[in-house]
Amino acid sequence: MTRYVLIGAGAIGAPVAAQLHESATDVVLVARGAHARAIREHGLTYARPDGDRQVRVPVVESAAELELRTDDVLVVATKTQATEAVLQEWAWRPVTGASTAAETLPLISLQNGLENERAALRRFARVSGASVWMPSSYLRPGEVVAPGEPQVGTFWLGRYPGGLDPDTERWADDLRRANFVVRLVDDLPRWKAGKLLANLANAADALFPDDDRAGELNQALRAEARQVLAAAGLDPADPRDDPEVDLRAFGLAPALLDRYGGSSTRQSLSRASGDTEADFLNGEIVLLGRLHGVPTPLNSRIQAAVASVARDGVPPGGVGTALLDDLLCDAAQQGAPTG
């Protein structure tokens, strides 16, 4: 029987683990610190449109606490900046009746950005990933909020760098039984690139959560990014144009909107975590721009701004409006579309 080991118990990993557990699928959640202690002692407080509940999902704090089996699937749901540490911890763990995790077990990345699957492939022989569309929040230890309805979220799931793992259909069936929409794709990098374009808005959501002009900045950031992705030979897939998945049928429960913490970057600032994914979102565009000779002044500047506020513990919206004024002025001067 397949057991899913969810590494990372934040806004993605915890809801996935809860849904799998409630659908009678074998799952273990890997959490840390106060979050792990709260889940172990009281269960995961899981807020859904039909109410809050305590989910007694099994939890461990490290690879050393778990005896890996040949039927395990490692599912990584940490922020990208934690990926290297995760791979170091788990790749060469022994697997009962086999050799090591990297040689034996499949790994699925449920993470943002373009770097995670590539990094995993350095150690793991079988790497898959998903472009994840799942509004959810982790703002306090032991609690996550998942307001999506009727399904919890949507996955575009495939093998990296292309094709499908022999077990992909079985994984998809387990996720569907757990109330997720799953679309199998054999061109995963296109879907990850499409999600990256959407995630470029995370920085503005964190810095300027209450300013309607942030939408104008996001258009300019994406216009800059599209030039970079084209130069890098990437053709982003737009999930809104997917004939097999109708995102218009997906909504957020009004009763949970006041508990939804916004983008993952805004949630990181709210928790004063000290770092964010911006280096692997806007920073990925900056990296590709430098590799392919495409200037990225807007993404570079907002990447640095997010890093500064995260370092200094500034909460969402704490930078004021002058920075947004400057960024919009820069966008206008370079001719980027903002409206």
Question: Residue spans of the language-model regions?
Answer:
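NAD(P)+-binding Rossmann beta1-loop-alpha1 motif at the extreme N-terminus of oxidoreductases
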Residues: M1-D52
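Nucleotide donor/acceptor-binding cores
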Residues: T2, D72, L105, G153-F155
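Residues at the starts of beta-strands that form the adenosine-phosphate
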Residues: R3, D26-V28, P106, R126, ...
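Rossmann-like NAD(P)(H) cofactor-binding subdomain of soluble oxidoreductases
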Residues: R53-E143
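Helix-loop-beta segment of a Rossmann-like dinucleotide-binding subdomain
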Residues: P94-A101, V144-R159, A203-D210, G262-S270
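Rossmann-fold dinucleotide-binding core
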Residues: N112-A201
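Active-site-proximal catalytic alpha-helix in oxidoreductases
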Residues: L188-V228, L252-G261
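NAD(P)-dependent Rossmann-like dehydrogenase/reductase catalytic/cofactor-binding core
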Residues: Q219, A223-G339
